Amino acid sequence: MKLIAGPASKELGERIARLLNVKTAPIFFKTFPDGESYVRFDVESLKDEDVVIVQTTSPPQDQRLIQLLLMADNASDMKAKSITAVVPYFAYARQDKRFLTGEAFSVKTVVKLLENCGVSRIITVNAHNPEVLNTFKISIEDLSAVALLAEYFKNEGLVENPLSLSLGKKALSMATEANSILKGGFDYISTRRDAITGDVALEEKKLAVRNRDVIIFDDIISSGGTMAKAVEFSKERGARKVYAACVHPLLMGDSQKKIMEHGAEGIIGTDSVFSPVSKVSIAPLISKALAKKEQKSG
């Protein structure tokens, strides 16, 4: 196995390599003054190698996606036997269908680009809609980091018998998965999204949060608006401590400040995206999936 740590996931790639007891392949990146990306593998050949490229595609997602495509196509040109793209945060996954007539089916386009660049397998983490990934021909494995987040809360002693909440009923599986470790019960905060503006409103729903510690789980925190509303919603109903937990802490703009000002005790995320709140590493999760595949092919 040859592991290539892309510029967006250098630290994560190196952590995965250490767990797998492999070295990362030397690689050189630069950005030209006009913004174009340059990639060079400092190896003579990748012939007959199983290549793993680790590159998250968080903002600036277009640049990071292009870098990923350049790396994959380059590995293909250098005769790699197989190419696995580890894309912890999968850009454009939220555009998982045509909500309005004439819209691009963005996630399908991204998957096609990766396929055309020689990628035979994709590993991602808590994709926004994992069901849509199963409709593509290419092998896509969606891992869940929720248990790692729950274990962090349990081991750090940040909360006592917490209620695990998801943002929206569709994401209830996140709360149930967390509750399998935290054991304090689970529920969801009811949400409604405007198809045109994308704005999310919270709907009135009874929640047993009074005098309880609460952890609100979501796959992504981007602008932080919905999470801030959810934290405030819980605090107004008597929750004692409220934590925000997410797999992909994009934390655009003043989102972190916004969530804290609405009453959060703290924000905990993973290193799928490097951020000030990335306290939990997904390296063990990914290395386990890669090792399992290696054993099967071996």
Predicted features and spans:
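PRPP-associated nucleotide enzymes
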Residues: M1-G298
